UniProtKB/Swiss-Prot annotation:
Binding positions (Mn(2+) 1): D255, H335, E380, E419
Cited function: Splits dipeptides with a prolyl residue in the C-terminal position.
GO biological processes: proteolysis
Stated family: Belongs to the peptidase M24B family. Bacterial-type prolidase subfamily.
Lineage: Bacteria, Pseudomonadati, Pseudomonadota, Gammaproteobacteria, Alteromonadales
Catalytic reactions on record: Xaa-L-Pro dipeptide + H2O = an L-alpha-amino acid + L-proline
NCBIfam families: PRK13607.1
GO cellular component: cytosol
Cofactor: Mn(2+)
Organism: Shewanella loihica (strain ATCC BAA-1088 / PV-4)
Protein name: Xaa-Pro dipeptidase
Gene3D superfamilies: Creatinase/methionine aminopeptidase superfamily, Creatinase/prolidase N-terminal domain
Length: 440
């Protein structure tokens, strides 16, 4: 296992380099990054679960403490204003002593409204990076989330440091551990809710710790792309299981999906075919390849797969041009992954913020970047029986492309999605998900 303490100093050097470049270009004294503040529930005295500013956790693994601030200018040692109130109602965060503290100067803040005493002077020369713009105004910042700075940071976030890649490998290991437990629970007869509990127990995470709401879908629920309902009662007939769930480590996410058939049948054969399709697309990944081209290649391969299984009729190109493949596979091939599950910067052509929109026929694609070394992306092709989309084909004259008898056979199983997390290297791809033993 990689030593994070060894990798972390170079990570800070790289982040400092980025800050120095963009602040010099924009004539800023530096950046003040706010971890965030709790959000109070309406007409209540309870807060929503706290989610830290991703720009904050890019520097250090403090992910659960609001009212913290980070002062960076690209030259000096980063300064952390760490919130430690006197509070007998709640658990107060311990003063950090982890590996990263040697690279960060730490000051303690005991009252959130006294932070001005610890912030730099002449805040009109500094940029505030965070969510709470009203706080930035009160404190007197000269700029708030300036577009040029945000575009620069989001563009370069795609290139992961060795420290970040190490964290993401650990996030993948946690996610795979949960997937193995969830698969066992499915074959043992567990309900969706019980499978969720098995996943959380295996990963040692609570529902507020996972990087996104787990999708635990049995049978036809797998046709709902973002299904999170969690039925407590097992279905009378157990047909299929789709799980889309990840792990978190030091603020970095994994995002993994698998689909299983309860018995050997046509649907199991479909899963195996989709698994081969997914691996073939991953083989195409290399620096210089456009992610859009991978998505389009997926539709080409899916068209042939649909024909092979007699779910459709016609020719592959016609299936694509008529939007038939999009009815079975309506979402994008995947996205960038890192501090956020859908990491920022997926549509940026350059550090100036030039936007590349997805193709008009594929509006839900989340990444249009050209691949480069040290990027991390998901590859997650799908095949679903979604009645609302198929009904559109019936209503607008495209019904003859579909073999409705075969569709009816597959409908009770819901759908298939297979998702791996892949690091693009200069000379090879590193499939973190498969390397950890989670095969299709």
């Amino acid at each position: 296992m990689e030593n994070l303490a060894t990798l972390y100093p170079a990570h800070i050097i790289e982040l400092n380099r980025r800050v120095a470049e963009i602040t010099a270009r924009e004539q800023l004294a530096g950046l003040v990054i706010h971890s965030g503040q709790p959000h109070r529930q309406f007409l209540d005295d309870l807060d929503y679960p706290f989610k830290v500013n991703p720009h904050f956790k890019a520097w250090l693994p403090v992910i659960d403490n609001p009212h913290c601030w980070l002062i960076v200018n690209g030259r000096d040692k980063p300064q952390l204003i760490f919130y430690r109130p006197v509070d007998f109602w709640h658990k107060v965060a311990d003063l950090p002593e982890d590996f990263w503290t040697t690279e960060i100067e730490i000051k303690v803040l005991t009252k959130a409204d006294k932070v001005a005493d610890l912030l730099p002077g002449k805040l009109q020369e500094w940029a505030y990076i965070g969510e709470h713009l009203d706080v930035a105004d009160v404190l007197g910042f000269g700029s708030r989330n300036p577009e040029a700075v945000m575009s620069y940071l989001h563009y370069h976030r795609a290139s992961k440091t060795a420290y970040e890649l190490a964290c993401m490998r650990r996030a993948s290991e946690i996610g795979v551990r949960g997937h193995v437990a969830a698969k066992s629970a499915f074959y043992a007869g567990a309900s969706e809710f019980e499978i969720q509990q098995a996943y959380l127990a295996a990963t040692d995470m609570g529902e507020n710790d996972v990087p996104y709401g787990n999708i635990i879908a049995l049978n036809q629920n797998a046709a709902i792309l973002h299904y999170t309902a969690l039925e407590h009662v097992s279905p009378k007939q157990r047909l299929s299981f789709l799980i889309d769930a990840g792990g978190s480590f030091h603020g970095y996410a994994s995002d993994i999906t698998r689909t299983y058939a309860f018995e050997k049948n046509l649907f199991g054969d479909l899963i195996a075919a989709m698994d081969k399709l997914q691996l073939a697309i991953i083989e195409m990944m290399r620096p210089g390849v456009k992610y859009v081209d991978l998505h389009l290649a997926t539709h080409q391969k899916l068209a042939q797969l649909l024909l092979d299984f007699k779910l459709v009729q016609g020719d592959p190109q016609g299936l694509i041009e008529q939007g038939i493949t999009s009815a079975f596979f309506p979402h994008g091939l995947g996205h960038m992954l890192g501090l956020q599950v859908h990491d920022m910067g997926g549509f940026l052509h350059d550090e100036r913020g030039t936007h590349i929109a997805p193709p008009e026929a594929h509006p839900f694609l989340r990444c249009t970047r050209t691949l480069a070394a040290n990027q991390v992306l998901t590859i997650e092709p799908g095949l679903y029986i979604i009645d609302s989309l198929l009904n559109e084909l019936k209503q607008d004259g495209r019904a003859d492309w579909i073999n409705w008898q075969m569709v009816d056979q597959v409908r009770p199983f819901g759908g298939i999605r297979i998702e791996d997390n892949v690091i693009v290297h200069s000379d090879h791809n590193e499939n973190m998900t498969r390397d950890l033993g989670l095969h299709g």
